[in-house]
Design a protein with these regions (language model features):
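Hot-dog-fold acyl-thioester-processing enzymes
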Residues: 1-78, 141-161
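HotDog/MaoC-like acyl-thioester-processing domains
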Residues: 2-11, 92-161
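Generic structural detector for well-ordered beta-strands
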Residues: 16-20, 86, 133-135
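Mid-chain, well-packed structural core segment of small domains
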Residues: 72-101
Length: 161
């Protein structure tokens, strides 16, 4: 992984990560943050809700945006400054989520970029939209991929049309 500096970033640059949502990943996040809402882990309870089955916590999907920023664009060394989010559809176990970040503004003098953020499910439906402000590293950061314990993400850093 190579973190880009403000001078390497351009309007329209895009990066994605793709992740399949599974019960183990949801359980790990629920345990890590203490979000024991039964909508995320209890099929009997979830059956009584409008969703009819467990759904992933919103922060799970939002975390994929963080992964795209921290590992792809601008990459290692970036500081995530702010994020606004809209959760549009539930994310269910088995869904494959594509988190995409697109540079929509570059403020070189302030070392800031504004990103459009979106997560899509395997049907191409938007499940999350938002906007983030990020401060790229002032120096290019090279961080070996081998330090990633469990690479759940598929790199699709090729340009998206």
């Amino acid at each position: 992984m190579i973190g880009k500096t403000i001078h390497e970033l351009r309007m329209g640059d895009v990066a994605e990560v793709i992740h399949q949502v599974d019960a183990e990943g949801v359980a790990e996040l629920v345990d890590a943050v203490g979000d024991y809402n039964p909508i995320h882990s209890d099929p009997d309870y979830a059956a009584s809700t409008p969703f009819k089955e467990p759904i992933a916590p919103g922060v799970f999907t939002a975390g994929l945006i963080s992964a795209a920023i921290g590992t792809r664009l601008p990459g290692p060394g970036a500081i995530y400054l702010s994020q606004n989010l809209k959760f549009l559809k539930p994310v269910k176990l088995g869904d494959t989520i594509t988190a995409r970040v697109t540079i929509v503004e570059v403020l070189r003098e302030r070392n800031r970029i504004r990103l459009e953020t979106v997560c899509l499910n395997q049907r191409g439906e938007e499940v999350l939209t938002g906007e983030a402000w990020v401060m790229p590293s002032r120096e290019s950061v090279v961080y070996p991929d081998r330090y990633i314990n469990k690479p759940p993400l598929i790199d699709t850093s090729a340009p998206v049309m």
